[in-house]
């Protein structure tokens, strides 16, 4: 084990504001848990747990290198968990694992059975299409087997399947192969049996051979016809129509709203809601749940002897079957496409990957099928799935993880918010480790306990949401769980917490002036793009300015001033730390900023001695052979050491001056032989002796870090910020950029706004009474003698901030009087710049969709606002149409 001491490459606080690497040092990779054991080893198998996190590690197992005994042990453990997952999902309608975890376990079993055929048997969970049926409904044999689909999770796997189909059919790659692409509905599979055009039975998929008879419930679904439409000669004697029962997003939201109004627990997602509704013992309950159905397959089809030759539609392929269904009045997904190349398949995947939140139901992938039914028969099937179809699964938007803790966070206006601390989990393209719980009432409503397995969703938005607990995972763990208790005092300053007024759900810290957490958040706000836009003044540097002792250790037992990292070998534990005799904690620092008032008077000299606390990481180093055959060392961060040291926040670590070339020696300089930057401060001198025996004095200096210099330059530019940006920077409650811009435009000067009344502000279009009262309350308080707000205004005005006239937009007012909502992400605009573009052209950039909305701009990963616009019939625009709207005020 090696403890790395401080050196001249000491890390600055800036490294935490801007974590980009220049590639000059080895990457440090986070890891935990089973990672210290070899995947597939005896110890690894024994340590494996039925958690989602451990399920995702199964993909790392090299099955080919395992012994038969180890493979059998792993198969037995994983098979038991898969079977439990199937029962929970298909029978109990109460899944305990995320879809991603279930898929990973199933893939592991399939790999083991392929490598060790003795593990494969008809009883394996891999051959079971769904769960075995429960005893609540009569079991009925399907007239023809109802199969599931194999899943793939990458484009490479999809390409392998596609090439396998071409090989299986001996199909030339240059010849178009007709296929269908369909969105994979996240619902429940259903087999509808019609005899002579009359609905006879509705069966769940069950295990694919036998399903549950839920006919009475099926008859309550309004989109499923009781009788097939069309002339008698086009109605078959017998047909099985396969499809999916699901709940539309709008119906799901209505159902949950009704549940909450009635004091019932809301459903976690539409799939669970549909499952619970379809398998109700009382069909009258199912009838109230607004279920929907789309057909996506065909089973047995017999036209019967009574049909004259060619008197009915011949069904040769999948797409023809869908056209026939439409004639019969059976709904088919409007999102289906016919394709003839792999590129067109990828186009479909890309399109719905970007528009997952835009359609009427939840989806988790794209299903690709060979269109020709004759070719389907040629390709055949495995024991559980057809070879002529595949399901490409998108990264999950909803996963399970562990709720490690609930902490509280103090915002810039004093609002104290519970924050869920999660075991890091990958969801919808990024790793999530924290998410807001809004207020203590929301924690109570969701019913989560610290230690719970919880569902995390990130659908249609960049902000993750904690949906609720997985109640099945509480069994046997009740003693490990605890309730969240909202603190009664501010964790930052100790002030007593309370609602701002009676009836408020939000709890606030009243110590607005002196609470370090509130000041830090206000500094972060004023530096943001929506206010002064001060680059390089990020979260960590704001903390360094306002609360540099935030992570100060409680005692010398965890103070290690000379240890910046601890290096261990694989499997090695760090040695216990013993502080040296006589070690004392450094004196407490006084923050550079105690108020926003001092921001524009900051100099680099003020920042010279600011230091912040950093925890020394534990770094595991192991050797591996690179692609060039050479041995290289790989660094992996395996956790924090619990030992803390200080680093300079804004100035560099001590640096030895670079020696000048002989021709560049400057005899007029204080150190003729060395280069010392003009802004450097020499902190010591060292005697250097050359090989020839001559000596020189080498200075060692510190200087403002490059990002510090840039930050101060940006602060200087911010003195001339637009008036509306100054208003946002003041952190007035409820006042955001759009309303700040409107007020600045209406009054013209900061002095006029300071003395405006509630009535005067309320008369401005788009300014409600609550915003008007917030503005007047803030400036009224600022006029009181000794009030910190007044001190901020006076200091900023003295620095030249906010003293100019509001600049009118020189752009044509193409959107005057119009309301535009932007949802999702756009390529050419950030969310704020899109709203700014609307406001600069006279429009209102609203945050929600209503009947008063004129247009909704829909970008990538748009959420419920797009669905709301569709429901209200409001025109929806893509990015190109949005640009046209900005230029002309109309869209062709």
Swiss-Prot record:
Organism: Bifidobacterium adolescentis (strain ATCC 15703 / DSM 20083 / NCTC 11814 / E194a)
GO molecular function, one term: metal ion binding
InterPro entries with a match to the protein in the record: BRCT_dom, BRCT_dom_sf, DisA/LigA_HHH, DNA_ligase, DNA_ligase_AS, DNA_ligase_CS, DNAligase_adenylation, DNAligase_N
Location of region: Disordered: 1-23
Gene3D superfamilies xrefs: 5' to 3' exonuclease, C-terminal subdomain (1.10.150.20), 6.20.10.30, BRCT domain (3.40.50.10190), DNA ligase/mRNA capping enzyme (3.30.470.30), Helix hairpin bin (1.10.287.610), Nucleic acid-binding proteins (2.40.50.140)
Matching Pfam families: BRCT (PF00533), DNA_ligase_aden (PF01653), DNA_ligase_OB (PF03120), DNA_ligase_ZBD (PF03119), HHH_2 (PF12826)
GO CC annotation: cytosol
Binding site for Zn(2+): 490, 493, 509, 515
Name used for this protein in its record: DNA ligase
């Amino acid at each position: 084990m090696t403890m790395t001491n401080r050196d001249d490459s000491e890390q600055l606080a800036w490294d935490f504001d801007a974590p980009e690497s220049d590639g000059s040092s080895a990457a440090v990779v986070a890891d935990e848990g089973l990672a210290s054991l070899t995947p597939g080893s005896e110890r690894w198998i024994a340590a494996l747990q039925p958690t989602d996190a451990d399920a995702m590690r199964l993909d790392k197992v090299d099955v080919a290198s395992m012994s038969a005994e180890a493979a059998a042990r792993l198969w037995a453990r994983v098979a038991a968990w898969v079977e439990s997952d199937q029962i929970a999902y298909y029978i109990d309608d109460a899944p305990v694992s995320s879809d991603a975890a279930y898929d990973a376990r199933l893939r592991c079993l399939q790999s083991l059975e392929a490598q060790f055929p003795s593990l494969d048997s008809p009883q394996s969970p891999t051959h079971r299409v769904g769960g075995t049926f429960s005893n609540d409904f009569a079991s009925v044999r399907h007239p023809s087997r109802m199969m599931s689909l194999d899943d793939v999770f990458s484009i490479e796997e999809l390409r392998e399947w596609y090439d396998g189909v071409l090989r299986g059919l001996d199909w030339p790659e240059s010849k178009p192969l007709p296929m269908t692409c369909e969105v994979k509905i996240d619902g429940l599979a259903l087999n509808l049996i019609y005899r002579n055009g009359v609905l006879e039975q509705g069966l769940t998929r069950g295990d694919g051979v036998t399903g549950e008879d839920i006919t009475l419930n099926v008859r309550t679904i309004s989109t499923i016809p009781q009788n097939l439409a069309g002339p008698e000669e086009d109605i078959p004697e017998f047909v099985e129509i396969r499809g999916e029962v699901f709940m539309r997003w709008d119906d799901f939201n209505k159902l949950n709203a009704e549940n909450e109004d009635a004091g019932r627990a809301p459903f976690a997602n539409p799939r669970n809601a549909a499952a619970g509704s379809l398998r109700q013992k009382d069909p009258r309950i199912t009838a109230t749940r607004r279920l929907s159905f789309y057909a996506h397959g065909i089973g047995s089809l017999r036209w019967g002897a009574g049909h004259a030759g060619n008197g009915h539609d011949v069904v040769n392929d999948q797409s023809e079957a869908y056209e026939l269904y439409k004639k019969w009045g059976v709904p088919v997904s409007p999102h289906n496409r016919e394709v003839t190349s792999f590129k067109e398949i990828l186009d479909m995947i890309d399109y719905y990957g970007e528009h997952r939140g835009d359609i009427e139901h939840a989806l988790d992938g794209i299903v690709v099928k060979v269109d020709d039914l004759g070719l389907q028969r040629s390709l055949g099937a495995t024991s559980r799935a057809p070879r002529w179809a595949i399901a490409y699964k998108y990264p999950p938007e909803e996963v399970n993880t562990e709720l490690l803790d609930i902490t509280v966070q103090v915002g810039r206006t004093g609002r104290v918010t519970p924050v869920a601390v999660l075991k890091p989990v990958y969801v919808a393209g990024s790793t999530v480790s924290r998410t807001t719980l809004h207020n203590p009432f929301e924690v109570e409503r969701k019913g989560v306990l610290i230690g719970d397995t919880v569902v995390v969703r990130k659908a249609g938005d960049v902000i993750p949401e904690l949906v609720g607990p997985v109640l099945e995972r509480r069994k046997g763990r009740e003693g490990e769980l605890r309730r969240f208790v909202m603190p009664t005092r501010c964790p930052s300053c100790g002030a007593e917490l309370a609602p701002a007024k009676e009836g408020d759900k939000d709890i606030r810290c009243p110590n607005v002036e002196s609470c370090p957490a509130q000041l830090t958040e206000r500094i972060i706000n004023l530096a943001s793009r929506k206010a002064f836009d001060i680059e390089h003044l990020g979260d960590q540097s704001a903390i360094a300015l306002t609360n540099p002792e935030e992570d100060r250790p409680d005692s010398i037992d965890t103070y290690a001033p000379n240890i910046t990292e601890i290096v261990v070998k694989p499997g090695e534990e760090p040695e216990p730390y013993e502080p040296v005799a006589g070690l004392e904690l450094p004196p407490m620092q006084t923050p550079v900023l105690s108020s926003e008032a001092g921001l524009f008077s900051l100099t680099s000299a003020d920042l010279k001695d600011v230091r912040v606390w950093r925890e020394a990481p534990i770094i595991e180093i192991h050797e591996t052979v690179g692609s060039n055959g050479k041995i290289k060392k790989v660094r992996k961060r395996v956790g924090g050491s619990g030992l803390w040291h200080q680093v300079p926040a804004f100035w560099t670590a001590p640096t030895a001056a670079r020696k000048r070339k002989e021709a560049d020696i400057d005899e007029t300089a204080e150190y003729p032989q060395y280069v010392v930057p003009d802004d450097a401060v020499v902190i010591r001198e060292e005697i250097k002796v050359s090989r020839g025996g001559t000596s020189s004095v080498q200075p060692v200096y510190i200087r403002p870090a490059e990002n510090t210099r840039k930050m101060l330059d940006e602060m200087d530019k911010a003195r001339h910020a637009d008036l509306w940006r100054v208003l946002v920077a003041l952190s007035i409650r409820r006042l955001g950029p759009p309303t700040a811009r409107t007020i600045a435009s209406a009054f013209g000067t900061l002095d006029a706004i300071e003395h405006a009344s509630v009535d005067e502000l309320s008369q401005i279009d788009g300014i409600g009474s609550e915003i008007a009262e917030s503005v007047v309350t803030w400036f009224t308080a600022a006029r009181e003698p000794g009030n910190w707000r007044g001190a901020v205004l006076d200091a900023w005005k003295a620095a030249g901030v906010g003293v100019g006239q509001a600049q009118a937009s020189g752009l044509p007012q193409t959107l005057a009087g119009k309301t535009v909502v932007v949802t999702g992400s756009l390529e050419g605009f950030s969310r704020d710049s899109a709203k700014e573009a609307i406001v600069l052209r006279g429009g209102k950039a609203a945050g929600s969709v209503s009947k008063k909305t004129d247009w909704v701009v829909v970008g990538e990963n748009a959420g419920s606002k797009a669905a709301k616009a569709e429901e209200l019939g409001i025109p929806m625009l893509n990015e190109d149409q949005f640009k046209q709207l900005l230029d002309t005020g109309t869209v062709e």
